[in-house]
Amino acid sequence: MLKRRRTFQAQEVGELDFSEELLELGVLIGSYRTARGIKQEDMAKLLGMSRITLSRIENSWLPLTMENFFKMAAIFEVRPEYLLQALARVTQRKWSRKGED
């Protein structure tokens, strides 16, 4: 028997809240930058943005574009999916604690 896939209505998708995941992604990016000894100002220059803009991304005040996400992965010398897997591990632990697996 095939499982029926649920289709989302546009309104439902618009109501989804990913703020926790975006916060975690910003923190993750900041952690990788710090662990690699890259100053915020230096990374911002590599990305073609101001240090303030990078700070706002790392603090989830501004969204991270896919283009900048891929650039960051290149700067960190990791595959983009590695960062996404790290994000998935963090959010999975949080969801498991909430009983939402």
What are these regions (language model features)?
Residues M1-V27, S31, A35, R79, ...:
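N-terminal flexible/basic segments that precede or flank functional cores
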Residues T34, K45, A74:
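Alpha-helical residues within the helix-turn-helix
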Residues V27, S31, K45, R56, ...:
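DNA-binding alpha-helical recognition surfaces that contact promoter or target DNA
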Residues E67-Y82:
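DNA major-groove recognition helix of helix-turn-helix/homeodomain DNA-binding modules
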Residues G37-R56:
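Short alpha-helical DNA-recognition segment
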Residues T34, G48, N59-W61, A88:
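Residue-level detection of the helix-turn-helix DNA-binding "recognition helix"
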Residues V27, G37-I38, L64-E67:
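Residue-level signal for the short linker/turn that defines the boundary of a DNA-recognition helix
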